[in-house]
Amino acid sequence: MFSSKRYLNSFGWEEGNALKEGGLTKPILTSRKYNTHGLGAKHDIADQWWDNVFSAQLQSIQVNTDNGKVAVQSNGVSTKLRMAKYHSKYSALSSVFRYAGRLCGTFEEDLVDKSLDSSVSPVSSKKVKVRKTSGKESSKREKSKKKKEKKEKKDKLKKKSKRLKLDDSHTQKRKRKVRDKESKKSSKSGLKKVSGTKKVKA
């Protein structure tokens, strides 16, 4: 079995002194579990502060058997209760959260008049977002939409005409090539050899 004392002694450690300046004077010992209690069970009962607070509050209640009435005697806040509040207030878990103001929406809501809300049945009494627009704004929107549509139509027509022109130019080039080839073939076939190198049309 591994002995930490023997290991440290091999480096020149003496009991009661640190191996280096400012170091530990005793070896670190690991805790071992030899009992049959569940995981997380602690030896110190004082850590169960909620149970202690509950029992302290139960002791402050007095029941009279003569009248059958229950009387609560308050002797001020017990030290255990104060400690419990302190622990719950400054626990590690609750210190993680940040408390801030309420988050608000990023846009404003215009609601329907309250006179309309009174005539509506209670089932459908939800607040409704209504955006009020003036006549000028709506006409501006319509004009801008019409302008966009006209522009899109013009762009489409331009693209289409360009495509047709390109197609026409390509077809005309092809037709010219075909005509040239045909004319060359016909000119070759129509010529006959006459006395050596001269060619005469027949």
Curated annotation (Swiss-Prot):
Modification Phosphoserine occurs at: S121
Region entry Disordered, spans: 118-202
GO cellular component, one term: nucleolus
One GO BP: ribosome biogenesis
Keywords noted in UniProt: Nucleus, Phosphoprotein
Native source species: Schizosaccharomyces pombe (strain 972 / ATCC 24843) (Fission yeast)
Xref: InterPro entries: PINX1
Subcellular location: Nucleus, Nucleolus
Domain of life the protein comes from: Eukaryota
Protein name: Uncharacterized protein C1952.02
GO molecular function: RNA binding
Compositionally biased region (Basic residues): 142-163, 186-202
Principal location: nucleus
